């Protein structure tokens, strides 16, 4: 059994999602958003760091998974996103959590089955996979999708390393 904290980083809104993995079962623990309403970037980064640190204290996760930076059309936005990621990662590393990073396309492919999925599709699948009563907020759903992706990737890595990977008719079982 392990508790995974997933993060969807942003300099204005950082989503977080916490799930518990027990074998192949996933259980929703909590999710939400860290909102930074101030204008100056250094203060926003401080708030991201403090918010992620508080979430780590509250939920005591075993590992930390975060979305990688994608190349945005706006270079300034990509740089700010990278800095917000850095603030979140430092919060995890300061608590000795292992950090795992996943590309947005990999996350969408894992959760929806389509690497080019829309946000609404991710929300719907997160709701379905975690048996939630309603769709979570978009940024929280993205963070939960990061955590779900980590569960699937780590589960498959465990199956491969333990020799429990069975191939039949070209499909994984």
UniProtKB/Swiss-Prot annotation:
Enzyme Commission code(s) on record: 3.1.21.10
HAMAP family: RuvC
Record keywords: Cytoplasm, DNA damage, DNA recombination, DNA repair, DNA-binding, Endonuclease, Hydrolase, Magnesium, Metal-binding, Nuclease
Species the sequence originates in: Edwardsiella ictaluri (strain 93-146)
Active site: 8, 67, 139
Designated gene of the protein: ruvC
Annotated GO CC locations: cytoplasm; Holliday junction resolvase complex
Localization per record: Cytoplasm
Record's function text: The RuvA-RuvB-RuvC complex processes Holliday junction (HJ) DNA during genetic recombination and DNA repair. Endonuclease that resolves HJ intermediates. Cleaves cruciform DNA by making single-stranded nicks across the HJ at symmetrical positions within the homologous arms, yielding a 5'-phosphate and a 3'-hydroxyl group; requires a central core of homology in the junction. The consensus cleavage sequence is 5'-(A/T)TT(C/G)-3'. Cleavage occurs on the 3'-side of the TT dinucleotide at the point of strand exchange.
GO biological process: DNA recombination; DNA repair
Cofactor comment text: Binds 2 Mg(2+) ion per subunit.
UniProt family annotation: Belongs to the RuvC family.
Subunit structure: Homodimer which binds Holliday junction (HJ) DNA. The HJ becomes 2-fold symmetrical on binding to RuvC with unstacked arms; it has a different conformation from HJ DNA in complex with RuvA. In the full resolvosome a probable DNA-RuvA(4)-RuvB(12)-RuvC(2) complex forms which resolves the HJ.
Catalytic activity line of the entry: Endonucleolytic cleavage at a junction such as a reciprocal single-stranded crossover between two homologous DNA duplexes (Holliday junction)
Cofactor(s) the record lists: Mg(2+)
Residues reported in the UniProt entry to bind Mg(2+) 1: 8, 139
Family annotation (Pfam families): RuvC
Protein name: Crossover junction endodeoxyribonuclease RuvC
Superkingdom, natural source: Bacteria
Residues that, per the record, bind Mg(2+) 2: 67
């Amino acid at each position: 059994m392990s508790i995974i904290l997933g993060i969807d980083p942003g300099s204005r809104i950082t989503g977080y999602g916490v799930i518990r993995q027990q074998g192949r079962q996933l259980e929703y623990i909590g999710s939400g958003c860290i909102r930074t309403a101030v204008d100056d970037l250094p203060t926003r980064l401080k708030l991201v760091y403090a918010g992620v640190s508080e979430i780590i204290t509250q939920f005591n996760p075993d590992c930390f998974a975060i979305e990688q930076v994608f190349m945005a059309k706006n270079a300034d936005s990509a740089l700010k996103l990278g800095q917000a990621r850095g603030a979140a990662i430092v919060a995890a590393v300061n608590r000795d959590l292992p950090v795992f990073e996943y590309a947005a396309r990999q996350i969408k492919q894992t959760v929806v089955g389509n690497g080019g999925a829309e946000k609404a599709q991710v929300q719907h699948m997160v709701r379905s996979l975690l048996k939630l009563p309603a769709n979570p907020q978009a940024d929280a759903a993205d963070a939960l999708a990061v955590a779900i992706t980590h569960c699937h990737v780590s589960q498959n890595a465990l199956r491969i390393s333990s020799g429990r990977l069975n191939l039949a008719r070209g499909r994984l079982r």
